[in-house]
A protein has these predicted regions:
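Membrane-proximal intracellular helices of multi-pass ion channels
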Residues: 1-568
Length: 568
């Protein structure tokens, strides 16, 4: 236990130490200032601007920004859909894999990677060619991450600017994010992963003879380059079906630490970016403190539950007093619990252990974090703007308590912003619960359940929470590669992405037009520790009120049955 706690402390220390300078650098990038490597980046970016006939100096109001974003993402989804259905006729397919078997699986995968979800209802090494993995999935990993960051920055601009309707240039934001932030870090991360044993090649699969004399096929591929952006962009889709528990994706404890670090370094850095751009670092610190408070709480619950173990399994003398089922011995309870918490804290979804094998409360933590919108540090951009919706609700509640018009950063939070905030929070929640309920009541939905009882309900809840939350991890006992789940979870991913982005950009546009009022004696200090605690409380209360009944029938009952030694 001591080693595990030291790992947790070291991880947070390294994360914060690196996120601070990265956050300051990202502020310069998104303020359109010159950065290191300007002589290299500027000409490269100008090529893209000229190809697209875009003037990066032309700023956009929120509706134009949003329209460009939606059209760009729709075209990306369409291109990936077509690529999957034609890969058999294209190069870089040494295994001669056929086209993706059904249109609904291709639709689900295209929606998944475009929305930064990376839900995978297929096995990567037996379904997709190298070209589809590189030109399709990896490209969308970059672009979906850049899109999330662009929305977060547009919201920050809306909060800090005054008397204007402009939020920046969408094309400049995603290009600068990709060239100056994502690509440089990924190059370094790829080399580090290769040094640890992650494979990177375009070779055909290798047939070998095992020690027992049987034949085995070992998959090859350009894994390290995809692994880097998979984690850094909080995407999560694995090259292999086993994801980051596969030794070719995540071979050592050092690679495991690096992958967890990559998942959270940009989301954490964006809090420092926020403080820099609003000229008040305490605002960023307060939101970060609230996130860290929730993160430590969630990690503690997950780790304690897995460390305590499963008494039913322990009674058989199989794995001792800890819950090692579904976990890699090279990682153990500590690294597995930390990875599970990190990957669902962010909208990542990469896994180094099987979440379906976690105990009731151990699996509850990843599920609840996704249901809350993955706002505890969160994904690239998505975590920040998701948490800002809770910030607006907290400020609104505080305003009601003291009898003042709610204000944030000197701007009034009025009825229009509150309505948009509620929409951004309730539409995803309603989608999770409604689609889960319908799946439980239909034969097509029930056909995917491999475990009866409360755990079967947990698998369905987890699947739709993962889809709506744009996470992508799964309780893998759910048979998701069917017409029902491919279409429904595909729609859930689209709703979860754009039903939040559109209200956020609308809020940003409204806030940008307002003037900034100077603080006075009656202004609530949103940069204080009190506000950080209130914000964490609001996140938990909203989550409890919304999802507790469903969770009580799923993972909570699952845990109680386990403690009583009951199986189902």
């Amino acid at each position: 236990m001591t080693k595990d706690i030291m790992l947790f402390v070291l991880f947070l220390a390294v994360l914060l130490l690196c996120a601070w300078p990265l956050g300051k650098y990202m502020a310069r990038v998104f303020n359109y200032e010159k950065t290191c490597g300007e002589r290299f980046f500027a000409p490269l970016e100008n090529i893209f601007y000229k190809m697209a006939k875009v003037d990066p100096r032309t700023e956009m109001p929120w509706k134009e920004y949003c329209l460009n974003l939606i059209i760009f993402n729709a075209l990306g989804m369409l291109s990936l859909f077509v690529l999957q259905l034609t890969q058999a006729f294209l190069p870089l397919n040494p295994q001669q894999l056929p086209n993706v078997e059904t249109w609904h699986l291709a639709f689900n995968t295209a929606a998944s990677f475009m929305t930064n979800t990376n839900w995978q209802a297929y096995s990567g090494e037996t379904t997709l060619s190298y070209l589809t993995q590189m030109l399709g999935l990896t490209v969308q990993n970059f672009l979906s991450a850049a899109t999330g960051a662009a929305v977060a920055i547009a919201l920050i601009r809306g909060l800090v600017r005054k008397n204007t309707g402009e939020l920046g240039n969408f094309w400049a934001d995603i290009i600068r994010c990709t060239t100056r932030i994502l690509l440089p870090i990924c190059v370094v991360a790829t080399l580090l992963l290769v040094s640890q044993g992650v494979i990177q090649n375009l070779n055909p699969y290798v047939d070998v003879q095992t020690v027992e004399g049987a034949q085995q096929t070992i998959a090859m591929g350009p894994v390290a380059s995809q692994e880097a952006i998979k984690e850094l962009g909080t995407n999560g889709g694995g090259f292999f079906n086993a994801n980051s528990s596969h030794p070719f994706e995540n071979p050592t404890p050092w690679s495991n630490f690096l992958e967890m670090f990559l998942i959270l370094v940009i989301p954490t850095g964006l809090l420092f970016t926020f403080g820099e751009m609003c000229k008040d670092k305490k605002q960023g610190y307060a939101v970060l403190a609230s996130m860290l408070l929730l993160f430590v709480l969630m990690l503690g619950v997950c780790y304690a539950s897995e460390k305590y173990g499963n008494p039913i399994v322990a009674a058989q003398g199989i794995s001792g007093d800890t819950a090692m089922e579904g976990k890699e011995v090279r990682f153990g309870i500590g690294s597995s619990s930390l990875f599970a918490t990190v990957t669902t804290t962010a909208s990542c979804g990469a896994v180094n252990s099987m979440h379906d094998s976690y105990t009731g409360t151990g699996g509850l933590v990843p599920m609840l974090q996704m249901m809350l919108g993955e706002v505890v540090l969160g994904g690239v951009g998505a975590g920040f703007y998701g948490m800002m919706l809770y910030v607006f609700i907290t400020v609104f509640i505080v305003g009601l308590m003291v009898g003042r018009t709610p204000e944030y950063l000197g701007k009034k939070i009025e009825a229009k912003e509150v309505v948009l905030t509620i929409a951004g929070l309730l539409i995803p929640a309603a989608t999770i619960l409604t689609m889960s309920a319908v799946s439980c009541l239909t034969e097509a939905g029930q056909a995917g359940i491999s475990n009866p009882g409360p755990h079967g309900l947990s698998e369905i809840l987890y699947g739709f929470a993962s889809g709506v939350g744009n996470n992508g991890s799964a309780f893998a006992g759910l048979g998701a590669n069917s017409l029902w789940y491919n279409v429904l979870i595909g729609l859930a991913m689209l709703i979860g992405r754009f039903a939040v982005i559109v209200p956020v950009l609308a809020i940003a546009g409204n806030m940008a037009t307002k003037k900034i009022a100077p603080a006075n004696a009656g202004t609530f200090n949103t940069g204080s520790s009190l506000f950080a605690v209130l914000l964490a409380g609001v996140v938990l209360i909203v989550g409890a009120l919304t999802f507790l009944p469903a969770l009580a029938l799923g993972p909570i009952v699952d845990q109680l049955f386990m403690l009583q030694g009951k199986v189902f």
